[in-house]
Amino acid sequence: MVRSYIPLNSLRAFEAAARQLSFTKAAIELNVTHAAISQQVKALEQRLNCRLFIRISRGLVLTTEGENLLPILNDSFDRIADTLDRFSTGIIREKVRVGVVGTFATGYLLSRLRDFQQHSPHVDILLSTHNNRVDVVAEGLDYAIRYGNGALAWHESHFMYAPPLAQLCAPSISKRFTPPTDLQRFMLLGSYRAMNWSAWFAAAGGSVPSPSQQIMMFDSSVSMLEAAQAEIGIALAPPAMFMHLLRSERIIQPFSTTVSLGGYWLTRLQSRTETPAMRDFALWLLSEMKSEGE
């Protein structure tokens, strides 16, 4: 097969700019000028006869064509770099980039990564924490661990675990109320969806929060629990992910009522080619989660 001309410089410029959504950062990474990155991207767009970026006031947004091209280039450049490293060091190593919501990272994954390292010593995990709205294309992630129902367009999702949600608060706050109806006097803390509290009140047999009740929303359950420990209010979160706080009695679960509203999912873009290292990580994690649920 005779390959057509491959514009490597343009592809490198696009990959760096798309991964960081910034021509300036791409120029710094590749040690060239901003103008050089712009020219290379423009040349690639002309060659492909399509736009790869949409320029907006806040920066750059990838077009559909750009989103399709970026993971292929991420994977290709990673493979080239890994192969060169293998030749120079004689050691075959692979990388897996995993984005994970902070709750699952601190409550489960971090304490078990050593087991994976022993299971697959040739694989390096590059871990970053995020909220559910992470841009896997811009971040160059192989996998994203999210909370919800797993329904994501253009993604392959594997269910892992659905811990129920319960009230968690500082011990000092729990002494100031008894039945669930007393909660109307306190600030409610939520993560992502205020309606989760309505579901909990319904499960407890009480009325939904009144329109006048204050609900403080967070984009991270970890931050929400920090607020709960600071006695700002009462959090609705999965106790299973905060056992270290419960064991140390920095927070308590005042009521036994729980509600199940979602779960943790291992997700991957369908366009993201699954490498052997990615498969090793996915099989290990899903096996661990299956054992957890038994």
Swiss-Prot record:
Keyword Transcription: yes
GO cellular component, one term: cytoplasm
Main localization of the protein described in the UniProt heading: cytoplasm
Domain HTH lysR-type: 6-63
Membrane-spanning parts: none
Gene Ontology terms describing biological process: DNA-templated transcription
Location of the protein in the cell: Cytoplasm
Pfam families, A to Z: HTH_1, LysR_substrate
Keywords assigned by UniProt, alphabetized: Activator, Cytoplasm, DNA-binding, Transcription, Transcription regulation
GO molecular function annotation: DNA-binding transcription factor activity; sequence-specific DNA binding
Positions of the DNA-binding region: 23-42
Role this protein plays: This protein is a positive regulator of gene expression of beta-lactamase (AmpC).
Family: Belongs to the LysR transcriptional regulatory family.
Name this polypeptide is given: HTH-type transcriptional activator AmpR
Native organism: Yersinia enterocolitica
Gene: ampR
